[in-house]
Amino acid sequence: MSSAVPTNSDAAAYQARNYQLEMLEASMKENIIVAMDTGSGKTHIAVLRIKAELDSCPPDKIIWFLAPTVALCTQQHKVIASNLPAVQTRTLTGLDKVELWTEQAIWDAILKDVRVVVSTYAVLADALSHGFMRMSRLALIIFDEAHHCMRKHAANKIMQDFYHPTVSKFGPSAVPRIMGLTASPVVRSNREELFTIETNLDAVCKTPRAHRQELLKFSHRPELKQLLYEPPDPMGLQVSSQTLRALIEAWETLDIEDDPYVKRLRKSSLDGGALEKALMTGKTFCREQLKRFVDRSRHIFEELGEWAADYYIYTSIQHLKTRVQTSYMTGDWDEAERAYLVSFLSKLPAADIQITLSDAACLRISPKLEALIGFLDAMDDPEFSGLIFVKQRATVSVMTDLLAVHPRTRERFRSAAYVGWSNSSGSKDFLGNLLSMHGQLSTLDDFRSGHKNLIIATDVLEEGIDISACSVVVCYDKPPNLKSFVQRRGRARQKQSTYAIMFPAEDSAFDLAKWQTLEQAMIEAYQDDERHLQSAIELERVNEEVVERFTVESTSAVLTADTAMAHLHHFCAVLPSQPYVDMRPVFSVETDIANLRRGIVILPNCVHPKVRRSEGQRWWRTERAAMKEAAFQAYKSLYEFGLVNDNLLPLTNKPELKVNKLGSIPSIMEASEQYDPWVDWAYSWSSPDIHQSRVVVRLNGAKDRELCMRLAGPTVLPPLAPMTLFWDSETTFTVAFEAPERVPHVPLSSVEDMRTSTVVYLQATSSRLLSTKQDFTALFGPDLPHTDLKAWLQMYEGNEPAVEVYSRRRDPMLMGVVRDCSRYNEPLLFRRWVESGDSPTTSVVEMECDPFPRRRNLLHRQTLATKKLENDKEDTPEPVNKMRTVAADQCTIDRLPFSNAILGLFISVVVQQLETELIATKLYETILRDVGFTSTQHIITAISAPSAQALTNYQRYEFLGDSILKFSVSCQLFFKHPNWHEGYLSEGRDEIVQNPRLTKAALDTGLDAFVITKMFTPRKWSAPLISERLERVAGKRQVSSKVLADVVEALIGAAYMDGGHAAAQACIRRFLPEINLHSLDTRTLSRSVAPEGARQTIHDRLKRHISYTFENESLLVEALTHPSCDYDASTQSYQRLEFLGDAVLDMIIVSAIFNHPVQMPQGHMTKIKHALVNANLLAFLCMEFAIPEERASVEQISTLQFEVISNEELVELWRFMRYRGLDLNNARDASLARHRALRDEILHSLQHDPHYPWQALSRLSADKFFSDIMESILGAIFVDSGGDLAPCEAFVERIGLMSYLRRILDENIEVTHPRNVAQQLAKSNIQFLAQRMPDEEGGASYQCAVRIEEVEAFVVRGCLTAEEAEVTAAIDAIDLLMERVNGSASVAS
């Protein structure tokens, strides 16, 4: 069966309360009166209308919301203020004593910067009457309960005396727009009355038509029920209630001459007329107070019974005495009058009031109340919520107290009184007025939350005030008119609810029939709605064919009207999900004068405004066909806009649709062998162009203690950076390289001499005999011209017996390395000669020698032997001396002095550095030639893997490059694809920056050959030979794919360090050609990505507080637009800007960390970055980022004098977010409540604690939108400034993030996550198992079990989020583990 409401098979659905948007659209076109049932959301339509008007009207205009009662004003203002937290709003009612504001200055001060005023009708009418307010100042007037705009009502006075005359004189542009709100049953009841209201308000009554079906889903009709009771005995007053009888008798016999007012007038000769009037009318203050008190007491007795009357009289007297004793009364009540009243009432007999009774019969209540209690007692509903309407305020208070003590009701019903606040400030009823405003402040909130389940109220709760839907509504007295009948009935909105009216059993059949007739009229009205719906359903059975068809030429993919609806829903389903947002498309239908329909579809606001709203191009008889065609046009538009691919599928990365072009890349893969520069040098020796560099070695940096040698090669030598070599803990050598120079005309013989000198140096410090091959690729020699090499070799090559050296008495300073022939030529360091024996012929020559240092890895300080510690005691013995004595006849001594021989130890290190430099130079000259590096210094760091254990590795640069790449790709996608929503942008970025993509880039460019992974091992090192390199064939090696990806990112970081962003972009472009920011004109694009036609106004103070002046303010509007903001079709949500701002923030934070003077390892930098961009920290800063704003209030300083008091309030950034939704409101308020509770703790931690506040921030658990708008504003600034990071950095500084970063860096604040700390303490033998725990009320909490060494140690329960549970558990685990460690240490000691 077809239906006007699409079924599941249609793959379409309406969003909840979609008719509210329909009414909003209608109100933007003309003045309207929104006529909808009670509880169907009229106030929310008004809020949407206010938001729309604020976005378009000048900032000096005011929106005025009118309501009939003070209570309703208070409620509506609360709703408006909650939904417009950044806008200055205020109420103006009798509570403010507005009627006494007689100066324009007071009104001007109160309304300064106020955009929305909520008041009673009379306040605006009087303000207009006295000229304190003008129609020209108003942008919009909203009339709540608009059916009051009739006859002499203040609402009608506003229109007749001011609106209509202004229209007649100046035209429609001179008056505000009008919106009325009323309950549709009231309007339907009288068409003539409706026409009058429309004329008075210059508006047209509108009821949702296109979504009538949905409206009916949210309105429930209660069952009408009559409660009969026996009327009271007319003679009952004479036989019961002794206290009431005494009060009446005392009142009737009261002598007016005893009245203090009359006595005062008789003593005065000034005003005889006043005395005569008082005696004639019998009206004085005291007599009027007593008269009303007697009347109320009698009414209480008749309505509620004897106990209630006695209770009322007794409580009122006690209340009066208390007020007199505490001087609570106002100064205009004469002391004598107080004493007179107290004296009069004290003479009454005391009533016997028993509060705690077990027998209901002892309460002596009226038959009417007995019937009510019987009705309530019969209610068998655990979810009961009820409302009882009574006539008088006194009845409200007494009935509430009586139900609280009655045995049949006190356990089941949690009663509360509500009478509103009208006239409460100016009331002269000092006697018998038991209800205070303060006592009912929380009544409605308690009722909504379920803390109270029964409210007794006057007719103040009939209309307007938003209370929860009730299951029972009781009229204790018959409704006075149809309006009251309808309004009260509208309060019973729960399913299967009851609407009860109490009747005396002897009431005439006419009255009973009257209400039955009214009920039948209401039933018929609703049946009329249902007939319209049934008619629509019958119409939908018409088979109306929609033949729309679209074909993609390249793939032959086809879109038809029958498939478009499903396609459109799938497109929305894969959009980035957001809390508090329904991502389904919104369908609506408009009707023309021929009753034909055209479909409209609106997509979520993360979709670009150009294709967010689509209309059908034809008019149809059925809604089904209209919506089908609208869906077709919408999806076709998505394809044409580039949001759907040629297969007519979303550009999504969902598994079922993804085609992974990269394939599967293993973690360990085959890559090119590390580039060997000595192969190129080996070939170069066939026709050498010899270059050399002077190598200068200084001991402990002293210039007067230096050694020199020369390094030569067959081609140009790259510049080499100085090195520091660590001999021992007290001795270092600095190796410096002078600028290389070409050496022309070097004969072959000299080259051979250099090879021989290289052997001399290498052999001098080696215990093993070198190979006979001497075709070294790199040559070393003394610091002499090549023509002097032969003489040098003749002098220093080889060795001689030690005995011969001894006989020549060589200077010990010129001694070479001693070699013990008996121990395989073990090298030793000569100390002194030792002779033993009695005569020269029998003496034995020996040498005292030190062992030759075994240490060869001179590059690393950490391999040094530990020397004597500074805190050692002076008598600590020195380590055993390893000096040896060897026989001279078993030793030889090298001719090369040890002072020169030591240079041989440095050759391996020099060659290793030269090799690294040659690899970097080759990379610089080939793959990176267009990047623009100025030197190879940063390249060496970027290509050195940690496994090589070199002095430097790529990890820090990879940390920097990762953020630069993310930033660059984010910018590229954002500016290149202004049509893409955040989901596409995120998936597109992930595809590019993922490790497999970077690994492939490294392989495609040949970068894999230049990644240095080989570890330098000096003990196994051998000088590279020409013969070996000429025979070498390049092979493969096993490399981690992540290492290749890391090196790409590290090179990007190196390029940034070398040449800033320009070099980094060139490097990115080399490996990822599709990323080319230089080809994008960001200044032009910053305007093109802005929403078109945005007219929203932004608070000037916000713009100043951000410290950035937007050229395109619509970007700031977009940055503040939450995905739930569905009422603005011209602005996209902030998600795109938040995507960009996230990358900008990363770039700023990472740059600051990286450029700090203290170099930190990558792991620590990563921890700091994660702590700084933590969503809860950003959310906290968002809540703290506030704008000072002036507010004015009026204080009464005397009877007729008022003073304007100015004060300053802080308006936080989050208040400016544009959104819609009660759930979001509630979540926001809950987050703010947690912020208030945790604020001092978090601020103290950020300013003083040595640890990052992980636990406090996890307990904050702020909703994501708080941090999102920080990042989206950052993105907006970046776009508007044309890609300039400087103003972005200024904003990050302004919110306080940079100052905390500096504190972390300067004071070494511990930022390690507690979970990681616990894992370190437990040596990773610990598990945290977080789990969601549903509760009986439908909510949930989180717990986290901690297992240490496979044993459950404890469980943390009752946390708001899994993160809070895990952080709390980790902190407790740290305490436990530290106790164990300390306990073990104590036992050990």
Curated annotation (Swiss-Prot):
One of its GO terms (biological process) is siRNA processing. CDD domains: DEXHc_dicer, RIBOc, SF2_C_dicer. Residues 564-658 form the Dicer dsRNA-binding fold domain. Residues 23-203 form the Helicase ATP-binding domain. Its cofactor is Mg(2+); Mn(2+). InterPro entries: DEAD/DEAH_box_helicase_dom, Dicer_dimer_sf, Dicer_dimerisation_dom, Helicase_ATP-bd, Helicase_C-like, P-loop_NTPase, RNase_III_dom, RNase_III_sf. GO terms for cellular component: cytoplasm; nucleus. Residues 368-537 form the Helicase C-terminal domain. Mg(2+) binds at E1138, D1268, E1271. Its EC number is 3.1.26.-, 3.6.4.-. ATP binds at M36, D37, T38, G39, S40, G41, K42, T43. A motif (DEAH box) lies at residues 144-147. Gene3D superfamilies: Dicer dimerisation domain (3.30.160.380), P-loop containing nucleotide triphosphate hydrolases (3.40.50.300), Ribonuclease III domain (1.10.1520.10). Residues 920-1060, 1099-1282 form the RNase III domain. It is an enzyme of class 3 (hydrolase). GO terms for molecular function: ATP binding; helicase activity; metal ion binding; ribonuclease III activity; RNA binding. Keywords: Antiviral defense, Antiviral protein, ATP-binding, Helicase, Hydrolase, Magnesium, Manganese, Metal-binding, Nucleotide-binding, Repeat, RNA-binding. The record marks K1264 as: Important for activity. Dicer-like endonuclease involved in cleaving double-stranded RNA in the RNA interference (RNAi) pathway. Produces 21 to 25 bp dsRNAs (siRNAs) which target the selective destruction of homologous RNAs leading to sequence-specific suppression of gene expression, called post-transcriptional gene silencing (PTGS). Part of a broad host defense response against viral infection and transposons. Belongs to the helicase family. Dicer subfamily. This is Dicer-like protein 2. It comes from Aspergillus clavatus (strain ATCC 1007 / CBS 513.65 / DSM 816 / NCTC 3887 / NRRL 1 / QM 1276 / 107).
